[in-house]
């Protein structure tokens, strides 16, 4: 099956210029407007010469409508009959040019005028299936698989991306708050000759050129304090720390740590 999908890569494009995304289209919808979008094909319902499908991009999902005669205006109908119906698979990334319209039930939809295959999905997506009674099967819910294949989790579980977005906004807000207090963001060494700053067991590696052992950072405290000694009033760092210890759901050997230090203040001011 993977080999068959690889053979379908011949029509892939390296570059595709988009003009909008699904979220912007829905919020600023204007019937008849021309749009160029790209995203992953998540579902489709083929009914002869026409087909409704769902396209997912970084901002959400939108319905798209494929009509053979709209796409293939000449006598040659192979683009719809061969490329769309036979060569495209769920999970493929495609680029679409089309016009906006609403269906009879009011669904905001893109009428496809042209489309291109941008990237081939070599393996089928683990999409959930619903039977006639409404029972859902084959959901991608295994915690082990979700953690090890986060890219698949992001594709098939819509709420996961929100966690990434919230984390980014939280870090951005913390950074702005510290910068408003005139803290300087810095970077300190990850490979250190002496592990310090915390009572933890380090990961050990070896520097071949210098022929010395090095330790992956367990804390960035000591280097930040040296910068305060050097004359900075306030410093902070979002640091990756590594501790070669036990692990559970809340304790990972690799984690992100925020540390900040300031001169001429006490712990009451810090709190």
Specify the residue positions occupied by each region the protein language model found.
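Class II aminoacyl-tRNA synthetase-like tRNA-binding/catalytic domains
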Residues: 15-269
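Single conserved hydrophobic/aromatic residue that forms the stacking wall/gate
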Residues: 1-12
